[in-house]
Amino acid sequence: MFMAMQNTSFMEVSMRIVRTRDYEDMSRKAANVISAQIILKPNCILGLATGSTPIGTYTQLAEWNKKGDLDFSQVSTYNLDEYRGLSHEDPQSYHYFMFDNFFNHIDINKNNIHILNGLAKDTEAECAAYEKAIE
């Protein structure tokens, strides 16, 4: 796995911890935060993660989108990482995961989806280009 982090500097940030009853409550609260940002700024940029934890959040967001309550048409996304050596068509890739669990279920412009290329010949150049695109 590789991530697009080259000239990373750390800054002090405060984190608010939110306690929830269960996974469903956590998923809905996370979806509320994301949807509020999209409503506030329809062309916002989201940083997205993979794995089992955000699936409930993605499901809730897709449900609101299907009902017409949330519009992803102007949203851009950047995924955090990708497995090196895996094609985007490989079911084990994060690219595949995101389309299967989220992007195929919302009205996002596919040109606004950004995921690292796991088959990039030059991973340093891939990460540098990704980092520049995020800026």
Give names to the regions the model predicted.
Residues 6-46:
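N-terminal glycine-/serine-/threonine-rich phosphate-binding loop
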